[in-house]
Amino acid sequence: GSEMCIRDSSISPAGIEALTARGCDVSADEVRPEALLLRSAELHGCEFNPELLAIGRAGAGYNNIPIPDCTEHGIVVFNSPGANAEAVKELELCSLVMASRDVLGSIGWVRGISGEGAAIPKLVEKGKSAFAGPELLGKALGVIGLGAVGALVANIALELGMTVYGYDPFMSVDAAWRLSREVLRADSVDDIFRNSDYISINVPYTEQTHHMLNAEAFAKMKRGVRIVNESRAEVVDDEAMTAALESGAVAKYVTDFPNEVILKAPNVIAMPHLGACTPESEDRCAVMAANQLYDYLLNGNIKNSVNLPDTSLSRMGVCRLCVIHRNVPRMITRILDFISDRNINVEHMINKPRDKYAYTIVDLGASIGEDIADSIRAMDNVLRVRVI
């Protein structure tokens, strides 16, 4: 069995069970593991042992993992996108209602009239209008980012009778299939800003999405827009959001990412990163990450990697050669020539590029020894070689 190290006490037991049931050696103190399974353990500044092949993150975000460093060391990093999508969708639904009607404020106010005895019913009738707010029915919701969560939010908003605009320049075929045809496609993010009474942002955090909602964006929106952010803190410029809330340009902001700046702003509902906090979601994330690690260790297949291309091949040969290398010309030719020069037949192969890197799986008609693997390791631009 493969040696796995769990770097987080918060990993769901279901994920660990998915590995131990298949004979993997799982412990929290493995010194030279072949794989790490983690949630929020911080890996920046860590020294990786040379045997480490893969890291599985139980969850979608991966800013606790030094991705470029891992890729250069030939370490595949997996995440589990979509495993917590249902949990986030349900919280976003709750957030849309809270952004509209002051449910939260009303609950606090009712607590405050405890002790008023028989007068409570009258006080309630008199005070309730202060917490009224518009219905979602018939309003326009703009969904920025139509991945696993965004598509679910768009679909459920349609069920509530909202008009839904969706914007996602990088939409996958899978997401397109999941999305209702009634979602209106926005050609630009500005279309979303102009048309929406409510905005839900569901994008990963990248250089391109940094402060996507900034002063310039708020200036293009309908006055009194209500915004929900359960994606990442950094996609919203908090200083600009504070100014927009103070001026009434934004009527309400619901965020899962509290910080000192935003907690001082008016009309904010801030939650303690509750998006994926359900037992079902934590189980799904851990099991998904564990299954992907196992398939990579056993078969060399890559699914849901954040740094290398998704690559899968059904096994056809006696032995499998897996090579992570830089995406440079003639790399595959050099590997295949080297193999055929030793009279070994190639039964099947696949090569996939991703930015500056690529991954090649070759199924061979005969077993190869470590000497051949070492010769391929010694080639320029090769980062990792495995024989399975």
Show where each model-derived region lies.
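An N-terminal-biased, well-structured beta-alpha scaffold segment characteristic
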Residues: 2-3, 7-80, 194, 214-216, ...
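Rossmann-like adenosine-cofactor binding region
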Residues: 41-46, 169-261, 277
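Phosphate-binding beta-alpha-beta segment of Rossmann-like dinucleotide-binding domains, i.e.
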Residues: 81-140, 301-306
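Oxidoreductase and adenylate-handling cofactor-binding alpha/beta cores
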Residues: 89-108, 155-162, 287-301, 336-340
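Glycine-rich Rossmann-fold phosphate-binding loop(s) that bind the pyrophosphate
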Residues: 146-147
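N-terminal Rossmann-fold NAD(P) dinucleotide-binding loop
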Residues: 150-151
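NAD(P)-dependent dehydrogenase/reductase Rossmann-like domain
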Residues: 253, 263-266, 274-388
